[in-house]
Amino acid sequence: MIFAKKTEAAGFKAGVKDYRLTYYTPDYKVKDTDILAAFRVTPQPGVPPEEAAAAVAAESSTGTWTTVWTDGLTSLDRYKGRCYFIETFEGQKDNQFICYIAYPLDLFEEGSVTNLFTSIVGNVFGFKALRAIRLEDLRIPVAYVKTFEGPPHGIQVERDKLNKYGRALLGCTIKPKLGLSAKNYGRAVYEGLRGGLDFTKDDENVNSQPFMRWRDRFLFVAEAIYKSQSETGEVKGHYLNATAGTSEEVLKRAECAKELGVPIVMHDFLTGGFTTNTSLSKYCRESGLLLHIHRAMHAVVDRQKNHGIHFRVLAKTLRLSGGDHLHSGTVVGKLEGDKDVTLGFVDLMRDDYVELDRSRGIYFTQDWASMGGVIPVASGGIHVWHMPALVDIFGDDACLQFGGGTLGHPWGNAPGAVANRVALEACIKIRNQGQNVLREGGNALREATKWSPELAAACEVWKEIKFEFDTIDTI
């Protein structure tokens, strides 16, 4: 009874009230320091858009399902998330809409993608009042961007380290992805690098299995790198996958790579986790190692149009966490990827300043300030006939990665690498002459086959191979 009197005197009124009374504020003026989020929301039948949107703002910031007396011990008006705009669509049977929410910067720990995601995409995705919810985009304010170190090195520093300019980089994932011994694996790496590739790569699930322990792989791959460099006079690299069961083991493997003198390591950032990724990125920056990032598991999170997190958000947060390369899809290969959507998040990975452009799925203008860019990696079901389209789509600041498109060459790995290098150089040549590479690229490849038997064989093998399916995730 005593406590009840004190509570009443303090003006606390227990009970449940609509979220929209507190968290829906259409008159709110967005601040430059706010983190902005665009959610695609599908509410349960009978739930008004304002209430559903306000529930998202509440549950991802200061709110809970009922009024609590400790609300009076802080300033909710300062710390709460606010839904400031709702965008509806005519003719939507499920009442789906886009809600825009502003979060005060004080809600988030500096330099922590882990904390950012825990708040914004935490409990709210299991909220019963919503049938589905998808985070379409985030606006990261410069004030928050500057609390992150970002990519270990960035695009320009990588080019300077490699001494390679004026064209995309060429890579290859070693296949079969599992089952090779370390020595045979090293041989496959050597053949690809000496044939003209800039990089070869561990597949995402190559860690340290009984058939090939990580240290053995690192040693044989380092030997392959040094041998191919001495023969070609070019800087070569292999993405040594440092992903492991613990963060300590990840850093241990990266340290071994540094001691061997190789230029780059790799991490599976979603399965490995953002905390480990940020720690590895810091180590790579201090050690001079480049960091290649694989997005294994991303489609579990981003492929469904109505629920999950769009890849453009994952790409933004990876840039904050740190990585010099990130797989981005190919548009033309075997993996999901709409062209306009892909170009949108490729710009978000590489550019310093990206304007709002809904035609490419970009909901907010993003200013990265001085943070370095991330090289997009096009990988998955691509071969020499795709080269003109890849050069047209991605330009120079990209890594084009041909796994089966190198190792599947009828004459072996090295000729497969030669074919890809010749195809790339042929497309770059006509582009630099002012020709339309998308329209004239096929003719350039046919012309190059007259003096490159390796390219001729590759063109013959893959002339009928296409991956033509409708894209699920469109604007």
UniProtKB/Swiss-Prot annotation:
Residues recorded as binding Mg(2+), renumbered to this chain, are 201, 203-204
Q: Where does substrate bind?
A: 123, 173, 177, 295, 327, 379
One of its Pfam families is RuBisCO_large
Is Methyltransferase found in the keyword set?
Answer: no
Which prosthetic group or cofactor does it need? Answer: Mg(2+)
Keyword terms: Calvin cycle, Carbon dioxide fixation, Chloroplast, Lyase, Magnesium, Metal-binding, Monooxygenase, Oxidoreductase, Photosynthesis, Plastid
Textual note on the cofactor: Binds 1 Mg(2+) ion per subunit.
> Where found in the cell?
Plastid, Chloroplast
Q: Which GO terms describe its molecular function?
A: magnesium ion binding; monooxygenase activity; ribulose-bisphosphate carboxylase activity
Residues at the active site: 175, 294
One BP annotation, GO: reductive pentose-phosphate cycle
Annotated site location: Transition state stabilizer? 334
Q: Which GO CC annotations does the UniProt entry carry? A: chloroplast
Which residues are reported to carry the modification N6-carboxylysine? 201
Family, per entry: Belongs to the RuBisCO large chain family. Type I subfamily.
Please explain the role this protein plays, according to its UniProt record: RuBisCO catalyzes two reactions: the carboxylation of D-ribulose 1,5-bisphosphate, the primary event in carbon dioxide fixation, as well as the oxidative fragmentation of the pentose substrate in the photorespiration process. Both reactions occur simultaneously and in competition at the same active site.
Question: What is the protein's quaternary organization?
Answer: Heterohexadecamer of 8 large chains and 8 small chains.
Protein known as: Ribulose bisphosphate carboxylase large chain
List the top taxonomic levels of the source. Answer: Eukaryota, Sar, Rhizaria, Cercozoa, Chlorarachniophyceae
